[in-house]
């Protein structure tokens, strides 16, 4: 396993729309393993392949305190089950150090493939539903900062660009 570099906003590669995984094989499972290692090391609770410059529809999530409930979503499809919206303060490994409230559906249904290529359906609510929606957005080239005002987004962009220059 290997730690993968995480792309940071405003990197244009984060806007790439991910392609479906055609076959779940050892190559894909190796990407998944590297993504989990990278996510846990960051530390984070979710990571989309787009964030590590792999433009395939792969998501890893683990919202547990002890990192013992890993979830893999390959080629996820999402349906809203409850139109009730709620606000949740979100952060992102690709937008480090920033947290903003985002409004999302409370209850969704996700259909995806697991790490063995088997289809499954999950109907999460709360934090897991938010996390899945956030990561699926990454696969579509969308970031949580797209949900905030243009002024806030530009402020975040400028601060991160300044940090990138200071690290260079």
From Swiss-Prot:
Pfam families: Pep_deformylase. Binds 1 Fe(2+) ion. This is Peptide deformylase. The keyword Protein biosynthesis applies. The active site is at 135. CDD domains: Pep_deformylase (cd00487). It comes from Teredinibacter turnerae (strain ATCC 39867 / T7901). Removes the formyl group from the N-terminal Met of newly synthesized proteins. Requires at least a dipeptide for an efficient rate of reaction. N-terminal L-methionine is a prerequisite for activity but the enzyme has broad specificity at other positions. GO terms for molecular function: metal ion binding; peptide deformylase activity. Fe cation binds at residues 92, 134, 138. Its cofactor is Fe(2+). Belongs to the polypeptide deformylase family. GO terms for biological process: co-translational protein modification; translation. Gene3D superfamilies: Peptide deformylase. HAMAP family: Pep_deformylase (MF_00163). It catalyses: N-terminal N-formyl-L-methionyl-[peptide] + H2O = N-terminal L-methionyl-[peptide] + formate. Its EC number is 3.5.1.88. Keywords: Hydrolase, Iron, Metal-binding, Protein biosynthesis.
């Amino acid at each position: 396993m290997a730690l993968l570099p995480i792309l940071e906003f405003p990197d244009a590669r984060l806007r790439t729309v991910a392609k479906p995984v055609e076959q779940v094989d050892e190559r894909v499972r190796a990407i998944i393993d590297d993504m989990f290692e990278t996510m846990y090391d960051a530390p984070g609770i979710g990571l989309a392949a787009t964030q590590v410059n792999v433009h395939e529809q792969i998501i890893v999530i683990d919202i547990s305190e002890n990192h013992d409930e890993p979830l893999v979503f390959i080629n996820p499809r999402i349906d809203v089950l409850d139109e009730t919206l709620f606000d949740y303060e979100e952060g992102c490994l690709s937008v480090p150090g920033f947290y903003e409230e985002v409004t999302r559906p409370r209850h969704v249904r996700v259909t995806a493939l697991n790490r063995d290529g088997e289809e499954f359906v999950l109907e999460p609510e709360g934090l897991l539903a938010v996390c899945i929606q956030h990561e699926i957005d990454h696969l579509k080239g969308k970031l949580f900062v797209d949900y905030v005002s243009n002024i806030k987004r530009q402020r975040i962009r400028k601060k991160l660009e300044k940090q990138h220059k200071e690290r260079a």
